[in-house]
């Protein structure tokens, strides 16, 4: 039971508080929540600008380029879904710091275009928010840090527990998995993951 409900039930709220206080407090609470959400999205957008610059430099120079001096990761790929105009830069590794600023290339999975299952993970409310709009049959382009681009076709989705994905990164197939938390609209962390599976079409010249 929250404090607003308990006060109202005892009559303290309605009898001793001015009528404008409740709407005012609700408005303040809303601004705080909106501000927190706005900060998260603003950080995500700013990070992608810096990551895009670092990724462009990485392709041009062939050297790992950090997006900012204190970063412990660097951009390794760009994921694009042209039909829905979605694009995001991927960072090396899936640590908490990496995922705070962009999708992460999950450790011990191959690069896009290589044999096996390349896995990229990101938060559902920022960088992989667009996954809810990806349809079966959509083409997904992944550009690596060496400048090579590979095209995949989305062919299925699944809901799995985080510790029981069933993904075999050493598969003989050429596949891509984009992973995020499930359900999309949840406000608290949970054990389930949404997986978008895609099969390699081939390199893009």
Language model features with spans:
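A cross-taxon signal for low-complexity, glycine/charged-rich
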Residues: 1, 7-13
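Hydrophobic beta-strand core residues of beta-sandwich domains
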Residues: 5-6, 134
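Generic low-polarity alpha-helical segments
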Residues: 6-7, 164
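Solvent-exposed, non-transmembrane regions of membrane-associated and secreted proteins
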Residues: 20-205
């Amino acid at each position: 039971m929250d404090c607003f409900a308990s006060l109202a039930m005892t009559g303290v709220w309605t009898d001793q508080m001015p009528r404008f206080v409740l709407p005012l407090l609700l408005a303040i609470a809303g601004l705080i929540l909106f501000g927190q959400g706005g900060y998260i999205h603003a950080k995500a957008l700013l990070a992608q600008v810096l990551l895009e610059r670092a990724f462009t430099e990485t392709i041009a120079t062939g050297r790992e380029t950090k997006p900012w001096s204190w970063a412990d990761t660097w951009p390794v790929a760009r994921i694009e879904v042209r039909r829905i105009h979605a694009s995001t830069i991927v960072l090396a590794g899936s640590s908490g710091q990496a995922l705070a600023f962009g999708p992460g290339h999950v450790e011990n999975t191959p690069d896009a275009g290589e044999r096996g299952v390349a896995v990229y993970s990101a938060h559902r409310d920022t960088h992989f928010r667009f996954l809810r709009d990806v349809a079966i049959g959509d083409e997904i382009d992944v550009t690596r840090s060496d400048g090579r681009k590979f095209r995949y076709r989305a062919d299925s989705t699944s809901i799995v527990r985080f510790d029981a994905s069933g993904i075999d990164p050493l598969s003989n197939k050429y596949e891509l998995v984009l992973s995020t938390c499930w359900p999309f609209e949840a406000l608290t962390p949970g054990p389930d993951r949404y997986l978008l599976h895609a099969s390699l079409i081939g390199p893009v010249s």
